[in-house]
């Protein structure tokens, strides 16, 4: 699975589909050409279950996109308090 496929799973909140992809050939640290990681996409959506899964599978919490944003800064900007709390628990 590629970034675009994972992006669609995250937008739909398909935790099981993403789990299957991560158990296959998808890395939890996959990113696009702008540096957007899968965890950042989950932060945009505010999806705590997806975020938790990505963290369990080794997603880099400190990864930055080309604008210098992290999953934490994105979740904070979007007002996704539960997602922010998830990231701060780790």
Give the ranges of each region predicted by the language model.
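Ankyrin repeat start-site detector
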Residues: 33-34, 66-67
């Amino acid at each position: 699975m590629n970034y675009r496929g994972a992006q669609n799973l995250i937008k739909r909140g398909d935790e099981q589909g993403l789990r299957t992809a991560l158990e296959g050939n998808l890395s939890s640290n996959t990113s696009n050409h702008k540096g957007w990681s899968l965890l950042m996409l989950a932060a945009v959506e505010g999806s705590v279950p997806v975020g938790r899964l990505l963290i369990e599978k080794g997603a880099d919490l400190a990864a930055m996109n080309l604008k210098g944003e992290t999953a934490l800064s994105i979740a904070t900007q979007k007002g996704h308090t539960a997602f922010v709390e998830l990231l701060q628990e780790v």
